[in-house]
């Protein structure tokens, strides 16, 4: 998780929200989650300094999947990369319509992926289900791929 935080901060995220899904492998109790969060925020600060960012992205408290979906509904766009999504053309068209300054939430699945019910809940709450291509990517790779695509699309 520390490596993911470091790299996503370098790529420009403004907030990181750890989410407990049905297939999340590491389960943290409240005490452990709080200690981890302090460490993760220190990693975020270090990565922000290294990449010369003026904003230090917050690592939010651990959320349930339902809480995260509800919170994400307040963003301009919510993306959920999913291996069973329609082809790359729809994803390209959607990304081509995104303008700089758009607040985007991106859900990245755990090891083992999202369950179908989780994808459907996100869709029902306004998420765009997209693909990152025909390959199944590891969690770490999927997150960096999604952010790299967005960075390329949105940076001046």
Annotate each predicted stretch with a short phrase.
Residues 64-69, 86-89, 137:
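A short acidic, often aromatic-flanked loop/helix-cap motif at beta-alpha or helix-coil junctions
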Residues 33-37, 97, 148-149:
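Short, hinge-like loop/turn segments at secondary-structure boundaries
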Residues 76-113, 118, 128-131:
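Active-site/ligand-binding-proximal alpha/beta "capping" segment
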Residues 115-156:
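Structured adenosyl-cofactor binding patch, chiefly the S-adenosyl-L-methionine
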Residues 1-80:
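RNA substrate-binding interface of SAM-dependent RNA methyltransferases
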């Amino acid at each position: 998780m520390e490596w993911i935080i470091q790299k996503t901060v370098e790529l420009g995220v403004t907030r990181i929200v750890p989410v407990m899904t049905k297939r999340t492998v590491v389960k943290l109790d409240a005490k452990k989650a709080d200690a981890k969060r302090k460490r993760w925020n220190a990693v975020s600060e270090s990565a922000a300094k290294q990449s010369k960012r003026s904003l230090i992205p917050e690592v939010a408290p651990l959320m349930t999947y339902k809480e995260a979906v509800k919170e994400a509904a307040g963003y301009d766009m919510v993306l959920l990369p999913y291996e069973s999504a329609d082809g790359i053309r729809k994803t390209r068209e959607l990304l081509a319509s995104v303008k700089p300054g758009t607040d985007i939430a991106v859900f990245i699945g755990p090891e083992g992926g999202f369950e179908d019910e989780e994808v459907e809940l996100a869709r029902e709450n306004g998420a765009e289900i997209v693909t990152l291509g025909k390959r199944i990517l590891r969690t770490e790779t999927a997150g960096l791929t999604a952010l790299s695509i967005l960075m390329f699309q949105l940076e001046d």
